[in-house]
Amino acid sequence: MEMLTLVRIGRSARLERLLPAALAEFPVTELPAEQIASTAGRRLLFAVAVDAYGPDEAFVRLLRTLRQNPDCLCGCIGGVIVDGAGELDTKQLARQLVLTANLAGCAFPGKPLVEGTGSLYNQHIQA
C-alpha cells in the first residue's frame, strides 16, 4: 500500500480523535505545511481545523506557498478534511484549498472533501 502524506493545518479535539481512527489501516507520514513546496508525486490528505474566528495564519501561509510554487504538487493526488468549530467557513476554505492545490498540480478525484461544522448539522449534505 502506498504511503499517505498527512498535511495538518491547525488542531482540534474532534480532528485529533478522527484522524487516528480514519487512518489506522494506512501507512502515514506527516509533513509540516511549511515543507509543502517539495511534495511532488505523493498522496496527500489535508486535515484543516478552523476555530470559530476563521482561518489562521498557517492556512494562509499554506495557500501562499502553493501559489508561489505553481508546480510543487505535480503528480499528487489529494483529499481534504475540514473541521470547523462554528457553522461558517468550512466549505469556503475547503474550496479555496482544493482550487489552490489543484493549480499547483494536485488532482482531487471523486468527492475529495469532508467537512464538519461545529454542530455537525451538515453531515447529511454532500459537498
Which positions does each model-derived feature cover?
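FMN-binding flavodoxin-like domain, especially the glycine-rich phosphate-binding loop
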Residues: 1-127
